[in-house]
Amino acid sequence: MARNRLTESEMNEALRALDGWQKVDGREAITRSFKFKDFSTAFGFMAQAALYAEKLDHHPEWFNAYNRVDVTLATHSENGVTELDIKMARKMNAIAG
């Protein structure tokens, strides 16, 4: 999977197809807040996403409070968003349903 930083237009195009994701202000990253019915469901989402992140060797920044999971994705080695981040975002959306 390519780790080349996406151009602004590539990132904008990818975000149009990613429900709920947006650019982070003041940083080259994307973010989304997921809300679930309860803590167990939120934690289950994180467990599934973590297993996928390990396969991809690309790990999210995230924060969990009860039924909410806030996620930020960026490829630190490229100082920006790459196809790996887009792939991870797609998978997280699929897991969340």
Curated annotation (Swiss-Prot):
Class of the enzyme per the UniProt entry, highest EC level: lyase
Record keyword DNA-binding present: no
GO biological process, one term: tetrahydrobiopterin biosynthetic process
Enzyme Commission number, as recorded: 4.2.1.96
Pfam families named among the record's database cross-references: Pterin_4a
Keywords from the UniProt entry: Lyase
Protein origin, superkingdom: Bacteria
One Gene Ontology term of the molecular function aspect: 4-alpha-hydroxytetrahydrobiopterin dehydratase activity
InterPro entries, per database record: PCD_sf, Pterin_deHydtase
Transmembrane segments: none
Catalytic activity line of the entry: (4aS,6R)-4a-hydroxy-L-erythro-5,6,7,8-tetrahydrobiopterin = (6R)-L-erythro-6,7-dihydrobiopterin + H2O
Family: Belongs to the pterin-4-alpha-carbinolamine dehydratase family.
Protein name in UniProt: Putative pterin-4-alpha-carbinolamine dehydratase
The species this protein was found in: Brucella melitensis biotype 1 (strain ATCC 23456 / CCUG 17765 / NCTC 10094 / 16M)
Lineage: Bacteria, Pseudomonadati, Pseudomonadota, Alphaproteobacteria, Hyphomicrobiales
